[in-house]
Amino acid sequence: MRACPDRSSALALLKKYNAEPFHIQHALTVEGVMRWYAAELGHADEADFWATVGLLHDVDFEKWPEEHCKKAPELLAEIGCSDEFIHAVCSHGYGLCSDVEPTAEMEKVLFAADELTGLIGAAARMRPSKSCQDMELSSLKKKFKDKKFAAGCSRDVIREGAERLGWTLDELLEKTILAMRSCEDSVNEAMAAL
């Protein structure tokens, strides 16, 4: 079992450096998505590690957007995160704001899913249900192809993430929809409690 900070310490660190509800919601979503992927890919015993990396992956973004993935090691050290944990967090910005390459399976999942959760979340907000529970792959693929929709979500990074995992783009899209369905209610409950 990999060492990681307990959830309450991780959440406190996230909230110390992030006040915007959007950033908190994104962190909680990526946490849930990473937990789902850990179980799905046969790493249930590492689910807490995967999820906590997801929770803290953007810990430095709100206050230091120009130093994203560069300020994170200092902040993560505040709660005693291991070098392995810090490497995983920093690897999600590979090629954009970090030279730390995602090499472990968990890092590749984070790299691929981070941008994609933003796209799926934006697509869900456009649906009558405001939810990804009834989202179909075909609907997401249309949004993916529309470069003007959720333009801040890099399609190139999402494609590269699928390639790094050895998956088709459709596999990544479909799995991440399922992952977001699994945590949508708990994320909404947590946001309502803020």
Positions of the model-derived regions?
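Predominant activation on well-ordered alpha-helical scaffold segments within soluble catalytic domains
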Residues: 11, 28-35, 70-73, 120-123, ...
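Conserved active-site and cofactor/substrate-binding residues in soluble primary-metabolism enzymes
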Residues: 5, 9, 25-29, 67, ...
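Acidic/His-rich, divalent-metal-binding segments that scaffold phosphate/diphosphate chemistry
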Residues: 1-64
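Divalent metal-dependent catalytic cores for phosphoryl transfer on phosphate-bearing substrates
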Residues: 43-149, 159
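A structured, mid-to-C-terminal "fold-capping" secondary-structure block
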Residues: 133-135, 139-194
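Charged/polar positions within long, soluble alpha-helices
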Residues: 39, 121-124, 185, 189-192
